[in-house]
């Protein structure tokens, strides 16, 4: 305590860092496909609507967190052990006009393919909503194209 204020004694403060969000219900979800999106609320809502596991990234630039850690302990390894065969990337629909979002999507797709996952890119008409949550709330589902 300093002059009536609590003071963090850790150098640089308390840092939570950017974390991945995992959303799944093993008793209900179809573990064949795993969805990756940006934003916690999109992951929660997407899993509930599509009945498939979701991982939410804190931002599209943080996709490499899926591959952090030792082999066998990474997020991608966890989903492989759950029986996931295809990964569907559902970044926001503005990827068609936002070069940075598109670039990060393509980097993620390439890395997932290096890990031997089948990869699909979720697409929808942007007029139906920017994010997967908007699309689902409007009563629609994404289509996806498999990447070779």
Regions found by a protein language model. Give the residues of each.
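Phosphate-handling DNA/RNA-contact segment within nucleic-acid enzymes
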Residues: 1-83
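Short, flexible/disordered intra-domain loops and linkers
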Residues: 64-70, 96-104
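Acidic carboxylate-rich catalytic motifs and surrounding loops in phosphoryl-/glycosyl-chemistry enzymes
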Residues: 120-130
